[in-house]
Amino acid sequence: MTLRLTNTLTRRTEPFTPLRPGKASIYCCGVTVYDLCHLGHARSYINWDVLRRYLIWSGLDVRFVQNFTDIDDKILKRASDENSSMTAVSERNIDAFHADMDSLGILRPDSMPRATQCLDGIRALIGELEAKGAAYSAEGDVYFAVMKHAGYGKLSGRDLSEQQENAGGRVADAEGARKQHPFDFALWKAAKEGEPSFPSPWGAGRPGWHIECSAMVRAELGDTIDIHLGGADLVFPHHENEIAQSEAATGQELAQVWMHNGMVNVGGQKMSKSLGNFTTIRALLESGVSPMTLRLFVLQAHYRKPLDFTAEALEAAATGWKGLNAALGLGERHGQSLEWPATPALAPVALVAPSNHPSEPLEPLQQRFIDAMDDDLNSSGALAVLFDLAKPLRALANRLERGDRADRPADELAALALRWRLLRDLAAVLGLRREADSESSGPGDDSTNQDEIQAAIDARIAAKSAKNYAEADRIRDELKAQGIELIDKPGGITEWIRR
């Protein structure tokens, strides 16, 4: 099986074949830096970090570019509210973005261009569009003429003629009067009094949002790239407009694959700053949620599906991570006493290729992991493999933590060492790393109590494996009486929540 990805452009799940053998070029739409990032941003960038890591692990040379929008109406408003400057607001939030992403283990992009640093390329691209008749100037503004681009709407499936009919009752404004068509959009905005501006052939002003990404893709990666990434809320108008601008200028396809992640929902509504129902990454981490718990919470759902944010779901993720973290820590905490061979620390990007694991009994598990990831990045299926790998390791870790001896044959301990190494390597593909106990606690965590609960769950799993269902039911009922409800999931995963 080869990697198959769902392409928003074709509305199909297709085999991924890079434009250049052995290489992959990826552009990810970044944040507008006027505020701290929320959980919706974390979801997007964790998902795309996993895509990048998996491509690297699969042997591709990946160039990953993600931009910053550092000039925008929202930034200017924030600067005005704070009696600050556009630059001060942008720099503060860029620093905060890096801190948040680093805490979540998200690899830094190879390049992170800023709109204000790419003005020459932006102006040049606008000039090309104007020379080709795809753009026109009006009173210092420059607009893209959507009716001049025959393919407009191919990403979102929108029909301009239908939209024009539905827009018949719109109230005209000054900008509308300058446009040749209601859905033409700004490439360059004339300067307004009191706002930062930059020189251009059309007069002082600043770029529109959509043209920034088109110019940065071209400057960093060329006219056609392998994969373009973003949230589902960017399909229209942002990505639709990107395609129109870039393809009108170059005559070539902008990206062969367009991928979009689903939204995070709170109470049935999309999490967003405009609705005021957002939770920042920083607030979550400061509340006691560990970075890897948050990462596991995101990866339990498929990247294209909505993700419901609830306290119960977050607590369940904390429970799952605690068991996985115990297994990941086995080699570091007890490897020497188990006489396991020393293994080098895994570098963030130096991921181990599949062929480096010759151990025959583990190959089916590794293949299950690969099959899941090849199936449009089925991260929940990949996590199920990690939990399967972790089961005997976690049981051994629990015994050793209680001071028990690891009385097992040498060949069995050697097999467990290989199992642990594979767990660590595959976890790294998902960006999951072992956390110290102080990091890995969840919201309202009582470490001793959680250890006891996990030990009971392990005993129940062992009882079920031995077909001692009466004992398994007894353990379940005993936990239920303590307000602990067990949730058995596919792949042999057992999670728990407090009632």
Curated annotation (Swiss-Prot):
Q: Where does Zn(2+) bind?
A: C29, C213, H238, E242
Needs which cofactor? Zn(2+)
Highest taxon of the source? Bacteria
Q: Which InterPro entries match?
A: Cys-tRNA-ligase, Cys-tRNA-synt_Ia_DALR, Cys-tRNA/MSH_ligase, Rossmann-like_a/b/a_fold, tRNA-synt_1_cat_dom, tRNAsynth_Ia_anticodon-bd
Extract the coiled-coil ranges from the record: none
Chain positions of motif 'KMSKS' region: 270-274
Say which enzyme class the record assigns: ligase
List localization entries. Answer: Cytoplasm
Offer a single GO CC term for the protein. Answer: cytosol
Give each disulfide bond as a residue pair: none
**For this UniProt entry, which segments traverse the membrane?**
none
Asked whether the UniProt record includes Disulfide bond among its keywords, one would answer: no
Q: How is the cofactor bound?
A: Binds 1 zinc ion per subunit.
Q: Which UniProt keyword terms apply here?
A: Aminoacyl-tRNA synthetase, ATP-binding, Cytoplasm, Ligase, Metal-binding, Nucleotide-binding, Protein biosynthesis, Zinc
Q: Which GO terms describe its biological process?
A: cysteinyl-tRNA aminoacylation
Where on this chain does ATP bind?
K273
This protein's major location comes to: cytoplasm
Catalytically driven reaction(s): tRNA(Cys) + L-cysteine + ATP = L-cysteinyl-tRNA(Cys) + AMP + diphosphate
Q: Which SMART domains match?
A: DALR_2
Q: What is its EC number?
A: 6.1.1.16
Q: The motif 'HIGH' region: which residues?
A: 31-41
Enumerate the GO terms in the molecular function aspect: ATP binding; cysteine-tRNA ligase activity; zinc ion binding
Give the family from UniProt.
Belongs to the class-I aminoacyl-tRNA synthetase family.
Instruction: Relate the assembly described in the record.
Output: Monomer.
Name under which the protein is recorded: Cysteine--tRNA ligase
Q: Write the lineage as a comma-separated list.
A: Bacteria, Bacillati, Cyanobacteriota, Cyanophyceae, Synechococcales
